[in-house]
Amino acid sequence: MPKKAEKPASFETALKELEQIVTRLESGELPLEQALNEFEQGVQLARQGQKTLQQAEQRVQILLNDTPDAPLAPFAPENDAL
């Protein structure tokens, strides 16, 4: 059973960890079970990164609203479990 990875502290940390996983997988030296575990962790990190980027994009869109007099709506990120 694969270990449940803790959430990385930041987007940059998650990206660096994902890059390391890709390097290990591309080496072709991992046993099948370990490669599958690494792949699973990589998918989770990629999804987390994608969600973080989507939230950042939403925040930017709120800040760049075309109507300068429009009140800013507070940003509330979704609390989805990955």
UniProtKB/Swiss-Prot annotation:
BP GO terms, sorted: DNA catabolic process
Keyword Transcription regulation: no
Membrane-spanning intervals of the chain: none
Pfam families reported for this sequence: Exonuc_VII_S
Keyword match Transferase: no
Gene3D superfamilies, A to Z: Exonuclease VII, small subunit (1.10.287.1040)
Record EC number: 3.1.11.6
Catalytic activity: Exonucleolytic cleavage in either 5'- to 3'- or 3'- to 5'-direction to yield nucleoside 5'-phosphates
GO cellular component: cytosol; exodeoxyribonuclease VII complex
Keywords from the UniProt entry: Cytoplasm, Exonuclease, Hydrolase, Nuclease
GO MF annotation terms: exodeoxyribonuclease VII activity
SUPFAM superfamilies: XseB-like
Compartment(s): Cytoplasm
Domain of life: Bacteria
Function according to Swiss-Prot or TrEMBL: Bidirectionally degrades single-stranded DNA into large acid-insoluble oligonucleotides, which are then degraded further into small acid-soluble oligonucleotides.
Subunit relationships: Heterooligomer composed of large and small subunits.
Record family assignment: Belongs to the XseB family.
Protein name, entry field: Exodeoxyribonuclease 7 small subunit
Lineage of origin: Bacteria, Pseudomonadati, Pseudomonadota, Gammaproteobacteria, Enterobacterales
